[in-house]
């Protein structure tokens, strides 16, 4: 439009959306939610070598009401899932989630009844970070990609509609129908499957604590 040529030095032009998103991405406060070994790598990012303070993220919030980003670092059990959802619901908008590591992203090697097969069953995830555990450089790369995503987010009423379309109100659902049977017939079927697996392994019945200790003492 030629307006830039008529402005004096020291004046920049930008729209409100870009300014708001820039302030948001430069002051993202993470919520500490370390559950396993990935949390050690997340702590390393806060050290002087990687210096997450460069991005205004050195303050790991102990309360979800003063946090913008939840970094789920580790596996999430079914008993922990309601707590995770409650912490997420207490975070103010706008809020973002990074699933750090394969355990948080897809359950990892813990494919059983006790572990949620991906935190996206519980909360909406904005960034998936592979690795077991991922290195601190990978976490920094995911944070930079999240910053780029924040810069493109709308700040008007359209943002709420987009968040709903992306699953911002993710319901707390069981991670697997196989390991979380709902009715009696499904529970009976799961018990028969477990009994068949025990027979294949040579154990006719599940061992109790005393029986297991006796088996170990006998050298079996």
UniProtKB/Swiss-Prot annotation:
Primary subcellular site in the record, as a coarse category: membrane
Gene Ontology MF annotations: 4 iron, 4 sulfur cluster binding; iron ion binding; NADH dehydrogenase (ubiquinone) activity; NADH:ubiquinone reductase (non-electrogenic) activity; quinone binding
InterPro entries with a match to the protein in the record: NADH_UbQ_OxRdtase-like_20kDa (IPR006137), NADH_UQ_OxRdtase_20Kd_su (IPR006138)
Keywords: 4Fe-4S, Cell membrane, Iron, Iron-sulfur, Membrane, Metal-binding, NAD, Quinone, Translocase, Transport
UniProt region (Disordered), positions on chain: 174-220
Annotated localization: Cell membrane
EC number, as in UniProt: 7.1.1.-
Family (UniProt): Belongs to the complex I 20 kDa subunit family.
Cofactor-binding details, from the entry: Binds 1 [4Fe-4S] cluster.
Native organism: Saccharopolyspora erythraea (strain ATCC 11635 / DSM 40517 / JCM 4748 / NBRC 13426 / NCIMB 8594 / NRRL 2338)
Stretches with biased composition (Basic and acidic residues): 210-220
Role this protein plays: NDH-1 shuttles electrons from NADH, via FMN and iron-sulfur (Fe-S) centers, to quinones in the respiratory chain. The immediate electron acceptor for the enzyme in this species is believed to be a menaquinone. Couples the redox reaction to proton translocation (for every two electrons transferred, four hydrogen ions are translocated across the cytoplasmic membrane), and thus conserves the redox energy in a proton gradient.
Protein name per Swiss-Prot or TrEMBL: NADH-quinone oxidoreductase subunit B
Cofactor: [4Fe-4S] cluster
Lineage: Bacteria, Bacillati, Actinomycetota, Actinomycetes, Pseudonocardiales
Subunit structure: NDH-1 is composed of 14 different subunits. Subunits NuoB, C, D, E, F, and G constitute the peripheral sector of the complex.
Protein residues bound to [4Fe-4S] cluster: 37-38, 103, 132
